[in-house]
Amino acid sequence: MPQISVRGIEMPESPIRKLAPLAYAAKEKGIHVYHLNIGQPDLPTPKAAIDAIKNIDRSILEYSPSQGYLSYRKKLVGYYSKYNINLTPEDIIITSGGSEAVLFSFLACLNPGDEIIVPEPAYANYMAFAISAGAVIRTITTTIEEGFSLPKVEKFEELINEKTRAILICNPNNPTGYLYTRREMNQIRDLVKKYDLYLFSDEVYREFIYTGSPYISACHLEGIENNVVLIDSVSKRYSECGIRIGALITKNEEVRKAVMKFCQARLSPPLIGQIAAEASLDEPAEYGREVYDEYVERRKCLIDGLNRIPGVYSPIPMGAFYTVAKLPVDDAEKFCEWCLSEFNYEGETVMLAPAAGFYTTPGIGKNEVRLAYVLKKEDLVRALFVLRKALEAYPGKV
């Protein structure tokens, strides 16, 4: 029988989704599963987007332009200007989700064997996209004890060699909820400038910042305009994960030309998704305020509740809608599996994402989990209670 590719063998399983069969089996038994494992917002999609889809009046659902509709890109220029990010429509390429923007960034900017420095824990699919592009992820570890703040510049420079081509950040961060400070962003800028690296900056959670700290975009950093490739998506801010619309943004004309070749090869981003995403920009500002206020309350509910459970510790996330928590267990992945396959409390259980899958360094994050606060508060309260009961009953607790 023919063998699968090395790429297929090396492709990692998603720590977010790989326990899904166990969750399905639990539900088949009639057990209610509280999903804290995946960043699927439960808040309503903007009415403007839903109405735009319902009111589509076209006789043909044709290909859209490979770079996305100009009308949508023009509206995005106005959206980004609110964050002091000054763009033209030509700087913006619409992609099939933020994931495609990451992949096309790698394909356009990196050669096989080139290395990308990424702070860990990191969004697990970055590794998958790097493998797809033949690139190599080199991680610099941040720790829960330090609140996931960046290490000093010397730690970065220890990793930089002739193969280093880029730094990749997610700000605010998935999975930790950490928000990079101005000092940290300037540190990254200086490294990018000194070693002439690309800076891939995933900024899909910019709407969700819960402190007085400012949002510092990679596009705000002076002197590296042609090094920056910004990754964006409508999935989280508008609860539109299913329409698969993202954006790749750069002032670097050569990068845009290269990216467009990959865009043309995949033909076009989703037509209907663009219609919905463009309409979302017309939603009254009240929508965004209500969503933000809801996440503020959920964040407090989850973090306060976690830190009241004996042996559990979570730092306070400053952005996004995730946190990484340390549990009093010997192996968080085994605990997550046990919760779905062997435990329930009054017919309920919880699904968490083992955090080890967000690290590449072996052994790190073994007793950590990522939780997403994408459930209404009463469900979060109940999920925390069930989690407490699970930890009390777990045979591998420490």
Language-model regions, residue ranges each:
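PLP-dependent class I/II
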Residues: 2-4, 8-14, 19-32, 38-56, ...
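Basic nucleic-acid-binding alpha-helical/helix-turn surface characteristic of O6-alkylguanine DNA
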Residues: 59
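Conserved N-terminal alpha-helix of the aminotransferase class I/II PLP-enzyme fold
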Residues: 63-96
